[in-house]
């Protein structure tokens, strides 16, 4: 039986009196890129932490390939780039990729990782010598070393200029074209519109709308206008 890469079923998460997720539902299908779109504090990072097994839901169920996210078998099929990701600045790009690849039984070939992540030509440079956009692409490369079936990207383009952001978009789409699934959290509406097969708008811990970017936009003048209307309800 084939299970969806990720499934949240009526998931809630409370921290004291704060409800970070509130009866949250989301299923990510194979081969699709889902953008979880919301303002700061909407619950995006909480959802990611629960999916990665770093936090447990207060109520509801979370499944990663049909299993508990804490199980090694399901985690081995997952890659992630978190906002807090840090790697040593003195290692070269190739050295980082070689090290991370050694953790997996069947990693992607070095050449393929460099090509997908757009790192060809800078693989011998030290991480600390790279621009912010290049460093983000290295973190993306490390997340795909294990050839994951599901990639989780938590606000991957925060702090990047427009050129670097669009460059990373290209690398993300290249990975999806391999038939993989991606969960992307973002508060950039242009990012969701450019990348996503499906957008889930989250507000105060609850999914308030889901659909293609065009469906979310509806009759509004722009996706931004539709988003503002949705979170104002």
Per-region residue spans from a language model:
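Catalytic Walker B motif of ABC-type/P-loop ATPase nucleotide-binding domains
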Residues: 151-155
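Conserved ABC transporter NBD signature motif
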Residues: 60-74
């Amino acid at each position: 039986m084939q299970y969806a890469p990720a499934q949240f079923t009526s998931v809630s998460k409370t921290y004291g009196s704060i409800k970070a997720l509130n009866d949250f539902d989301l299923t990510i299908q194979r081969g699709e890129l889902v953008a979880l779109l919301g303002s700061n504090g909407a619950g995006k990072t909480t959802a990611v932490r629960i999916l990665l097994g770093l936090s447990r839901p207060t109520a509801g169920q979370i499944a990663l390939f049909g299993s508990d996210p804490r199980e090694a078998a399901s985690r081995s099929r997952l890659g992630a780039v978190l906002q807090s990701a840090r790697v040593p600045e003195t290692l070269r790009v190739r050295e980082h990729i070689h090290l991370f690849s050694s953790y997996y039984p069947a990693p992607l070939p070095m050449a393929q990782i460099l090509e997908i992540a757009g790192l060809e030509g800078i693989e011998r440079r030290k991480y600390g010598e790279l621009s912010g956009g290049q460093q983000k692409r290295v973190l993306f490369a490390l997340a795909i070393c294990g050839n994951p079936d599901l990639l989780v990207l938590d606000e991957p383009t925060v702090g990047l200029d427009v050129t670097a952001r669009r460059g990373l978009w290209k690398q993300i789409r290249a990975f999806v074209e391999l038939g993989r699934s991606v969960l992307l959290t973002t508060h950039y509406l242009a990012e969701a519109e450019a990348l996503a097969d499906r957008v889930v708008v989250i507000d105060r811990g609850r999914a308030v709308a889901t659909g293609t970017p065009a469906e979310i936009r509806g009759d509004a003048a722009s996706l931004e206008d539709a988003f503002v209307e949705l979170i104002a309800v």
